[in-house]
Amino acid sequence: CIRQNFFPGSERMFMEICNNVLGKDFYESEHHTTCGGIAYHCDTIPQETAMTIVARQFALMTEAGYENYVASCITSFGNYTEILETWHEFPELEAKIREMLWKSCRKEFKKPKYLAHSSDLIFKFRNEIAEKAKFHLVNKETGEPLRVVEHIGCHYSKMFPSKGVGGAEYPYVLTGM
């Protein structure tokens, strides 16, 4: 809901790069919804509601036969990471959410084996992307690489520093490219 509004087409382009440029197997369900993260962080929905929404996303992943999950939005990544960590610490809460999900829409899920943010995958495949790039981020006059500023959202690196490339103090996603 945030990323799509601030950066229209970014999710579609991410899928285009992954599926058609890199030849990777990525799937986006037409039944996928917002994660509820903004509503949760604004205190308009309770934590259990946000968790049930995320559990439904994981159920869609499970139903499609996938075991890894890529979040495109920084808030979603932070929300999913926080939820998985909470379920790890409080398995009884995960059981409650599983029950709520079953009662609400008759769905079950497996937790993802690996949760990644889309920028982590762009970083992982940066060399392959560079080899296939039609355009390069260089000064057209000098051929020198452009100097850019990187801002990594706090939901990406500060809440769970071990989950993002470079951590909270030295984010390395764009710099490393």
Language-model features: where?
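Iron-sulfur cluster-binding electron-transfer modules in prokaryotic oxidoreductases
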Residues: 1-177
